[in-house]
Amino acid sequence: MAEAWRYSAQGVAVAVRVTPRGGRDDIDGLETLSDGRPVVKVRVRAIADGGEANRAVTELLAKAVGVPKRNVRLLSGATSRQKQIAIDGDPKQLGEALRRLVAAKPAE
């Protein structure tokens, strides 16, 4: 399966599909959308109101890959379930951390 992130000199940009009010804060592995694009499935307890779910997603990803919260920001999709999230840091280390996270859950 293809990776749901792109590498850059600053870090990685991750394609995610968010489930707000998902019962828990967790990364649920990879999913392939109907158009064939892979995304990282993320669920958060926060509601999709006033940017709460977006903040929860960036905080969850920061903790999961081991970077400060200030290194994770929303690139696009502020009002959509599908988002692009930038994570600043060493691209190789971030890619390895993301691979480990999604490998722990089966792909759909």
From Swiss-Prot:
Stored SMART domains: DUF167 (SM01152)
One Pfam short name: DUF167
Family indicated by similarity: Belongs to the UPF0235 family.
Protein name per its UniProtKB record: UPF0235 protein Rpal_0418
Organism annotation: Rhodopseudomonas palustris (strain TIE-1)
Taxonomic lineage from the root: Bacteria, Pseudomonadati, Pseudomonadota, Alphaproteobacteria, Hyphomicrobiales
